[in-house]
Amino acid sequence: MKKALSHDEVEKIARSALAEDEQLVWCGAPDPRASLIQHARIAIFGSGVGFLALWWLSRLTDHGIPDLTKFHYTTVFILVSFFLLLIGLAMMSVPLVVHRNARRTVYALTDRRCMIVRLGKVRRIRSYTREDIGKIEWMIGPRGKDNFIFGTPEATVKKGGTPFRRAGFYTIPDAKAVEQRLREVFRMPEETA
């Protein structure tokens, strides 16, 4: 399994994405193991769904393999159990996909924007300016790694993200300090509860 990016590699990647007169304020990368732990519940639930589907399938085929050429109620239940099995397998793979994506992600805060850089065959950079940031949330995550969420849902979707998860820096150490730096750079007031 490939190791996470070193701080020097992260900084080099972040600096390569800067504009000519842009200053790097902070850069970092998500912790792949913390990302994996954060999504473990999905895999546990998915294994339950998968085992339920296998059990159901074994009960349906207990009297021999049914004739699937003729329509019968067991045909429908077998198809449903296969569908549930696929859902369970997909859910069990979520932590591994998140772990792989965390190893390929770099976060950067500059004097003009927040950047999320995704490495792969094609380097994808999503930039969030002051107007895109919206309400800032800070959440405590696993293993001392916190989540710093900042993108408005509209800006996240507009920049190619999913509407179910706002943009932000996930599973980073000391997200509160990064939040303070962002507020200083963009001159945003501290929110009171």
Could you describe each region identified by the protein language model?
Residues 33-104:
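Alpha-helical transmembrane spans
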Residues 113-157:
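Acidic, Ser/Thr-rich low-complexity segments on the non-lumenal side of membrane proteins
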Residues 23, 122-125, 163-166:
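Short, mixed charged/polar active-site loops
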Residues 23, 106, 147:
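A residue-level signal for beta-strand positions that form part of recognition/binding surfaces
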Residues 2-28:
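Short, charged cytosolic
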Residues 2-3, 140-193:
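A membrane-cytosol interface segment of integral membrane proteins
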Residues 26, 89-132:
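Conserved beta-hairpin
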Residues 20, 47-51, 127:
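Long, distal/terminal scaffolding or interaction modules
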